[in-house]
Structures are given as C-alpha cells and as structure tokens.
Amino acid sequence: MSTAGKVIKCKAAVLWEVMKPFSIEDVEVAPPKAYEVRIKMVTVGICGTDDHVVSGTMVTPLPVILGHEAAGIVESVGEGVTTVEPGDKVIPLALPQCGKCRICKTPERNYCLKNDVSNPRGTLQDGTSRFTCRGKPIHHFLGVSTFSQYTVVDENAVAKIDAASPMEKVCLIGCGFSTGYGSAVKVAKVTPGSTCAVFGLGGVGLSAVMGCKAAGAARIIAVDINKDKFAKAKELGATECINPQDYKKPIQEVLKEMTDGGVDFSFEVIGRLDTMMASLLCCHEACGTSVIVGVPPDSQNLSINPMLLLTGRTWKGAVYGGFKSKEDIPKLVADFMAKKFSLDALITHVLPFEKINEGFDLLRSGKSIRTILTF
C-alpha cells in the first residue's frame, strides 16, 4: 500500500535534553512539500558531530532528531522534484548544494548558503518541521535528521547514488569519509613527497590519513592519546604514530624536531582549541598549511600571535571536505564502486538502530571507529 502523500508513523531517536540518552519514540513524519524528498533510511553512521550536540558543545534547537551520515531509499517526492524519484538509492546531504547562491556558483567553494550549520534553525529550508512526537514539533538536524526510520529533506540536500552500491558502507561517504579524505586531497591539496600530521584518529581522522596517502605524502604522522588506534592508522597509511602523553614537551615541538622544522600539512580532526593550536604550530612557519576539520566548541575563541601567519603559514578550515555535496558525493560513491578506496577498515561495529545509545557509548569510550546502525 502506497504511503505517498500520507503521514508516516515510525520510530526515531529523539534527544530531549543535552547530556541525556536518546529516547526511541513513535514519531509522525509528514509528507514532503514542494521540492522536498521523503526517505526511508536503511543505514546510518554515528559521527562525533552528533555527540557534540549531546554534550552541549554544539548548540542546536531541542528537542531534536540527530543523525546526518546515512543512506536510504526515496519513499516519495514533493511537487517539482526532478533529480530523484521513488525507489532511488540516495545519500542525504548535511551540507546542501542549492546551485544558486554565490558560494555554489564559485567552483572551489562548497559552503552553500542554504546550510543549517552556522545559525541552526532546526528546520527544513522553509522554516518548518516535518516531525511530530507526543503532539509537539521536533527539530531537524542539519536539514537531514537520519536517526529516524523516515525523514524529509530538501531536494538540494539529497544525492542519487549507484543503485548497486552497498548502503551499509557508502553511508560513510555522507559525512565522515568525505570530510576527512577531502580535507587532504581537496582542501589542503597535499602534494607528493610531503610530510603530514593528523591529530585525532577517529573515522574522520583516519579518512584524512587515507587522503594524505592517496595524494602521495611521503610521511604521515598520526597523533592520538589512544594507542589502540595506531594499528588501524598504520593499516590505512600512517608511517608513524605518536602519543602526546609519551612526551614531556608540547607535541608541536616533538613534531617540529621530527620533521626538520615542521610538517608541510597538518589536520586537526578532534575539535579542541588546544589541539587546533598545536596543529597550527607544528606546521612549518615558512610553508606549512594547517586545516581545521574538527567542529570547535560553540562560542569559544582562540587568541594567536599574527606573526605565526606572517612568516608564511596558511590556516584554513572546511566543511564536508570541500566537496560540493550534490555533485561530488555520487562521484565518490562511483570511485568506491571502482575500488579506488575501501571503507571496510573504518567500520568496527554494526548494531540495530534500537541500540543507538550503546553505539554512542562505544564512540565515547574510544572502542569504535565507526558504528553503523541498521533499520
């Protein structure tokens, strides 16, 4: 029986308050309006950005359905939708690509002005929600909200992918893999023979290691306080792994001594102000490029000496690995299908959706790289 045009009742993980577990609730998902798409979720990854909301370091309106790294199948479309149709395999896009704003029209930029990152509204682009629970509207997260059996997104925030692609793997291309990999190959533009340092060896950090290797870096130094992640980092391309807790001097000084004055490229993939500064300081003062990849704590500032940049360093940041989401995500899936890279090493756990809180416990304890939830 077709559900198109009807309200769908399903299960979703609702975050009612920060610092509290998710609650599996019965929610109502309204039909898509014009230029919107309703998706039946199949797989979803647990990303550190979701946990930033739970911990309160990333502020978004509550109550909310989180989740933004996923794959699913189009259930129905609203009036005017032309780029996907019911039955298509898709990846929801936490960073939209409207194709019309000044950023979308700039070839090397991807931070579409329709995003819900800078000043989160917690709604779709028309300013309203499609979720209801206990008679109350529930907020969206980054315009996608994939911790739900069904979700509604704007057409500019969904990409059709290869019908043969395994959704339990390519869902990672919806955030973690593309963010890390792109930070190396597209944002920093790592050069062959260069030296790189990657701070943080979660799913995104390890994807950055993969990007550095793909770009031809000669040395890739992985930095983390969890030594259990070193074997995986070396498997994916790290040439050396170091733990800051093993040294009495600041880690940036250790890295500078190891690399004749500093690395060519550094990546902060944690989201801490102290490691952002260490990442900047460890790159060479005359030619180093440092990329902020981790989401920083809300409303906190860094103070730096401008001389650190005057000598020739470049300090930059990017969302989504610099990729233009709607056009580049299908290309990355095609590359995966062509075996240009593997995602297997990033997936350490697979759990049923109902065990979402267990999945977040694995993340917080450092026992997982990526946990995939299946519906």
Swiss-Prot record:
What Enzyme Commission number does this protein have?
Answer: 1.1.1.1
Record keyword Metal-binding present: yes
Kindly state which keywords UniProt assigns to this record, in alphabetical order: Acetylation, Cytoplasm, Metal-binding, NAD, Oxidoreductase, Phosphoprotein, Zinc
Q: Which residues take part in binding Zn(2+) 2?
A: C98, C101, C104, C112
Q: Which residues bind Zn(2+) 1?
A: C47, H68, C175
Q: Which residues carry this modification: Phosphotyrosine?
A: Y35
Annotated residues that bind NAD(+) are located at 48-52, 200-205, 224, 229, 270, 293-295, 318-320, 370
Substrates-to-products reaction catalysed: a primary alcohol + NAD(+) = an aldehyde + NADH + H(+); a secondary alcohol + NAD(+) = a ketone + NADH + H(+); butan-1-ol + NAD(+) = butanal + NADH + H(+); 1-propanol + NAD(+) = propanal + NADH + H(+)
One Pfam family name is: ADH_zinc_N
Cofactor comment text: Binds 2 Zn(2+) ions per subunit.
Which residues does the record list as N-acetylserine (modified residue)?
Answer: S2
Name where it's found. Answer: Cytoplasm
The cysteines joined by S-S bonds are none
**GO MF term list:** alcohol dehydrogenase (NAD+) activity; all-trans-retinol dehydrogenase (NAD+) activity; butanol dehydrogenase (NAD+) activity; zinc ion binding
Which cofactors does this protein require? Answer: Zn(2+)
- Key word Signal present: no
List modified residues, type Phosphoserine: S23
Name one cellular component (GO) term.
cytosol
List the PROSITE patterns hit by this protein, alphabetically: ADH_ZINC
One GO BP annotation here? retinol metabolic process
Recorded hits in PANTHER family, A to Z, give: ALCOHOL DEHYDROGENASE (PTHR43880), ALL-TRANS-RETINOL DEHYDROGENASE [NAD(+)] ADH1B (PTHR43880:SF11)
Family under the similarity heading: Belongs to the zinc-containing alcohol dehydrogenase family.
Function, as annotated, reads: Alcohol dehydrogenase. Oxidizes primary as well as secondary alcohols. Ethanol is a very poor substrate.
Q: Subunit info?
A: Dimer of identical or heterodimer of closely related subunits alpha, beta, or gamma that are encoded by genes ADH1A, ADH1B, and ADH1C, respectively.
Question: Would you tell me the protein name for this molecule?
Answer: Alcohol dehydrogenase 1A
The record lists the organism as Macaca mulatta (Rhesus macaque)
